Regions:
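Conserved Rossmann-fold NAD(P)-dependent oxidoreductase catalytic core, especially the SDR/UDP-sugar
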Residues: 52, 78-105, 122-125
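C-terminal "lid/loop" region of Rossmann-like NAD(P)-dependent oxidoreductases
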Residues: 159-161, 193-197, 204-211, 218-235
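Adenosine-cofactor binding site in Rossmann-like domains, unifying the SAM/SAH pocket
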Residues: 26-42
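NAD(P)-dependent short-chain dehydrogenase/reductase
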Residues: 103, 113-180, 184, 212-214
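N-terminal Rossmann NAD(P)H-binding glycine-rich loop of SDR-like oxidoreductase domains
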Residues: 6-23
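Conserved C-terminal active-site "lid" loop/helix of NAD(P)H-dependent oxidoreductases
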Residues: 42, 175, 208, 225-249
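NAD(P)-cofactor binding segment of oxidoreductase domains
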Residues: 50, 64-89, 109, 113-114
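NAD(P)H-binding glycine-rich loop region in Rossmannoid oxidoreductase-like domains
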Residues: 40-72, 96
């Protein structure tokens, strides 16, 4: 299958680096220091596909500074569409868009609607909790575990949710599985659906994630239970697994 002329926004990020390595035959556009928030009059009508990954993604930060998230995520998406007017859009949304309870989630829902109203071809992916190692990021661990490796203490935000152990439930998906789905979306016709959930279909609590990590590596952290974080969803599970997705990795592979 011929690879289209591809632009990846956020190509220097965790997911973007892995995706770029999986598209070796794609024609690359090296657009140096382009900030999606500040368009410089770039218009490239020959680009046939944009994988739009660039965004701000911290739920707590979005609650503290919502305008930052709306200007970057929504305004930036509009700028991307103006820069590549003829491109198929492959958009990275979020599982939080199912029940948005933060400016981050709301910003992604807005982007989804703008894309549907504007783009002739689009595939909207709702990402769940991406993790796992890759050549560009050998560990790919959540910030909480990265911090715990240094301090010996892991903070769980909220232990009184209506879940089996009181902690949040998440669908963890490996970065390799996510980027395989993105490659398919680049190569194949646009889905033109409301959304395509990119998750494993297997849910785990935050505590289960932590226990799996500790068991795999023989580490023990002191667990501190903090207050719930504003904007955190108690449960984030996929309603179905997208046909673009063939999950191969387990939670043990991700940690």
């Amino acid at each position: 299958v011929k690879i289209p002329n591809v632009v990846i926004t956020g190509a220097n990020g965790y997911i973007g680096k892995v995706l770029a390595d999986k598209l070796p035959d794609a024609k690359r556009y090296d657009i140096n220091n382009w900030d999606i928030k500040s368009p410089r009059g770039i218009i490239l009508p020959t680009v046939t596909c944009v994988v739009h990954l660039a965004a701000l993604v911290r739920v707590g930060e979005s609650v503290r500074d919502p305008l930052k998230y709306y200007s970057t995520n929504v305004g930036g998406t509009i700028n991307v569409m103006r820069a590549f007017p003829n491109a198929k859009m492959v958009f990275a949304s979020t599982g939080a868009a199912f029940h948005p309870d933060s400016p981050y989630g709301h910003s992604k829902v807005m982007c989804e609607q703008i894309i549907k109203d504007t783009c002739k071809e689009y595939t909207i992916f709702r990402f769940y909790n991406v993790g796992g190692g890759s050549p560009t990021n050998p560990e790919g661990l959540p910030l909480g575990i990265e911090k715990a490796k240094k301090t010996g203490t892991f903070t769980v935000y909220g232990d009184d949710y209506d879940t089996k152990d009181g902690t949040c439930v998440r669908d963890y998906i490996h970065v390799d599985d996510i980027t395989d789905a993105l490659v398919r979306a680049v190569r194949e016709p646009a889905a033109m659906t409301d959304y395509e959930p990119l998750g494993s279909g297997r849910s785990h609590t935050v505590k289960e994630y932590l226990e799996t990590y500790q068991e795999k590596y023989g580490k023990q952290f002191d667990i501190v239970y903090g207050d719930r974080r504003p904007g955190d969803l108690p449960v984030s599970e996929v309603p179905f697994v997208s046909e673009f997705m063939t999950p191969k990795k387990t939670l043990e592979d991700i940690v």
